[in-house]
Amino acid sequence: NTWHNPANNSVKFISVLIFYLFAVVFRMDEAEKMPIFGRMVGKRALDVAVSVLTCVSVWLKPSFFQVFAPALAVYFVTDFIQTRRSFKRYIREAAVFVPPAFLILYQMKTLFFSGAPSGGVEIAFLDVWSHWSPHILLSILAVTAFPILVSVFCRSGPEMNRIMMRSWVFYAVALLELAFLAETGNRRYNINFGWGMCLAIGIITLSALMQFISYLHLDREDRGYRLTVFAGMMLLSMQFFLGIWYYWRVLTTPVQCF
């Protein structure tokens, strides 16, 4: 379940901080500054902070960066299509993640490509996921129904919409890793490619919640607005109570997923 791995738990707060801090820093100009704890901090200092935090997260457990790294490529491509920025800008942004990239490559070489019988990675579509979850589509719908509604009906400002889009990209990469990748050997069903999904669920739910709260503060009282708010409240409540039921099942049965 999502809480039995202490290393992944220790990465959760850091991964959320990196994700949203990078979303802000990526939009900043080189000379721009932002207030943090009463001090004005420049983009370069924030880039260093993102790099250091990402290294710490990889050192604790690579589950965040193994999803965030490929998601970054998607962010850069979509941003280039929309803005036509110079390639130098993307190279500078990517350079922030060179240290954690070297660290995670070293970890993966040690874990998966050391020649040990318990190491190795292969493509095995839904093999590991279906081993733990007999109802994969229902599991996906249970955690994405609220974010889907928010993304479709609760449009907010451009910055929140961008964050929501990036959250979906992060979730999609995590889902694909869990769906397609499997370890070889005796760790095959340890679902180690699923820890990124645990982080992605938290990030996309938090992004959807922030956008929904922003939508609640709109100066509207029309019927469509009230129906959207009601549906959002119902889906958010459903996700909350499904979570309670899930942990009750974890505590009372050997089932890890549903």
What is the predicted function of each stretch?
Residues F97-L105, K109-F258:
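Transmembrane helical bundles and short interhelical boundary loops of multi-pass, membrane-embedded
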Residues G38, L46-P62, F68, A73:
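Membrane-interface alpha helices of multi-pass inner-membrane proteins
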Residues A49-V52, Y90-E93, M160-S167:
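Interfacial segments of alpha-helical transmembrane regions
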Residues N1-D29, H135-L137, I191-I201:
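Membrane-interface micro-motifs in multi-pass membrane enzymes
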Residues V24-R44, V48, V77-R89, V152-E159, ...:
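Membrane-interface junctions at the ends of membrane-embedded or membrane-associated helices
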